[in-house]
Amino acid sequence: MSRVKVAVLGATGSVGQRFIQLLDHHPFFEITHLCASENSAGKTYGEVMKTRWKISSDIPAYAKNLVITTPDPAKTKDVVLAFSGLDSNVAGEVEKNYANAGIHIISNSKNHRMDPTVPILSAEVNSSHLEVLTSQKTKGKIITNSNCTIMGVTISLKPLLDRFGIESVMLFSMQAISGAGYPGVPTMDILGNVIPHIGGEEEKAEIEPLKCLGKVENGKILHADFSISAHCNRVPVFDGHTVCVSVKFKKKPSREEIISSWKDFSGEPQTLGLPLAPNPVILFREEEDRPQPRLDLDTGKGMTTVIGRLRPDPILDWKYVVLSHNTIRGAAGAALLNAELLYKKKFLG
C-alpha cells in the first residue's frame, strides 16, 4: 500500500527535527518535501544540518539528500498533509495558504488554536472534535496541537473530568529549555537559575485545556466549565515539562478511584492500534520522588504521560505531579499521532 506524501514546515527547527526522526520508516507517511527559511532553501537537508541537528540519533538517511524549499504550497503540490513546526510569527499566514490550496495542516503553533472550528486535538482526549472540520471553509483542514506544557495536564485531567467532574485547577509548571526552541534561553540566564515568566504561557495554560476538554455543539467547540490558574516557570532541564497540579472536584473521589481512572484510561488511538499510540497512556508511579525527567521522560518512547505524588490538597481536594516529553508527546509525537488518527478514520482520502 502506497504511503501518504507529506511535508514538514520548519524542518530545521527543534520540532521539525523530531518530525523527521519520528517519520523515518513510518508505515502511513512518506516525507517528500522539507521546508524552511530562504537561508536554507536550495541546499540539501544534510548540508544545512551538519552542525544544527540536536537529536542524539543521526539524521535519517532518507532526509539527508532532500532539497529544502521555502514553505509554499505551489512547491509541494503532490503532498496531502503538512506537519508544521513553524514559529508563530510566520505560521498563521503560511498554514492558511496551505489549507486554501487543499493541503491539510497539523500545526504546533498557537495561531489557529482559538478558532472554534479548529480542534486542539489530543488524540486520546478529544477525537470527537474532528467533526468540526466540516465547518472549516477551506478544502484543506487545519488541526492544532495544544501548548506542550498542558498536553500532559490535559491527558491527566480527562479521566478525572469524566468520572468525577472538576470545579477548578491550579497548576505550577517547571518547563524545560528545549521548549524555547534553538538556540533558546541564553546560558547566563538559565544556568543555576529559575525564570518565573515565559511570555504567553500562563494565558495558554489557563484556556487551552478548557477547549481540549470541551464539547462540540452546532459545528463549534464549547469550552469546559471549570477554571484554571497557572504559574509557568523555565528551569535548567533540557527536555521534559514537569507540572504540579491541584484539583477541586464536583464529586469527591478517593485516592484509589483517581489512580484507577488513570490506569484505565485509553482512547481511540489504542483501540485502532495506531503505530505511535502509547500503552499505557498514563503511567502512575507510587515512589514518593517520581516522576523525574531524567528517569521517566522516555517512558513509552516519550509518548506516555507519567504521574506521581498523588496526595490530599488542604486547599483544593487532591494534588499530583505530571511529566511529559515536551518535544515528543507535547509536539511532534502528538502531531504524528493525530495524523495517524486522521489516516485511519479516512480523513486524508
UniProtKB/Swiss-Prot annotation:
It comes from the Bacteria. Keywords: Amino-acid biosynthesis, Diaminopimelate biosynthesis, Lysine biosynthesis, Methionine biosynthesis, NADP, Oxidoreductase, Threonine biosynthesis. The active site is at 148 (acyl-thioester intermediate), 241 (proton acceptor). GO terms for biological process: 'de novo' L-methionine biosynthetic process; diaminopimelate biosynthetic process; lysine biosynthetic process via diaminopimelate; threonine biosynthetic process. The keyword Ubl conjugation does not apply. Catalyzes the NADPH-dependent formation of L-aspartate-semialdehyde (L-ASA) by the reductive dephosphorylation of L-aspartyl-4-phosphate. NADP(+) binds at residues 12-15, 39-40, 178-179, 326-327. This is Aspartate-semialdehyde dehydrogenase. Phosphate binds at residues 113, 204. Pfam families: Semialdhyde_dh, Semialdhyde_dhC. Belongs to the aspartate-semialdehyde dehydrogenase family. SMART domains: Semialdhyde_dh (SM00859). One of its GO terms (molecular function) is NAD binding.
